[in-house]
């Protein structure tokens, strides 16, 4: 099966569908920003809009060049996975391409503390 090339109009429609599916306004804003950032990066690099190789390069760009935290990168990957799913539904993306994108692993969050951590002295006082 040959790779389908997505038009700009199809990309915008996919992004709109994915953003509208979010219940929270905060999620909508984050998804919109993430898809816009990805689209701008793809335009600069002149790569295929949505392919496994492009998403992997983008993940590396976010990690190595932008130096984003794993949770931020994983948000971007989640948006791209949703776009891939929507691409199948709208028949603008080959199912094999979308499945390859869906199988891209999350960036591990090892060694990164989440939440508010108290210094040892304050924690002992509370206990």
Question: What are these regions, as identified by a protein language model?
Answer:
Residues 3-15:
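Short alpha-helical hairpin
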Residues 10-11, 54, 118-121:
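Alpha-helix N-cap/N′ positions at the starts of helices
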Residues 107-127:
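Long, amphipathic, Lys/Arg-enriched alpha-helical "connector/arm" segment
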Residues 12, 16-29, 35-113:
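N-terminal core-binding DNA-recognition domain of tyrosine recombinases/integrases
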């Amino acid at each position: 099966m040959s790779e389908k090339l997505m038009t700009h109009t199809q990309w915008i429609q996919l992004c709109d569908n994915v953003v509208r599916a979010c219940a929270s306004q905060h999620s909508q804003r984050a998804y919109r920003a993430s898809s816009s950032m990805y689209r701008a990066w793809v335009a600069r690099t002149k790569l295929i809009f949505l392919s496994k190789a492009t998403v992997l390069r983008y993940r590396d760009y976010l990690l190595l060049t932008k130096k984003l935290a794993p949770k931020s990168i994983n948000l971007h990957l989640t948006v791209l996975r949703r776009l891939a799913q929507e691409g199948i539904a709208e028949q603008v993306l080959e199912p094999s391409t979308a499945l390859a994108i869906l199988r891209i692993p999350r960036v591990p969050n090892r060694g990164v503390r989440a939440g508010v951590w108290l210094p040892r002295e304050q924690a002992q006082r509370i206990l």
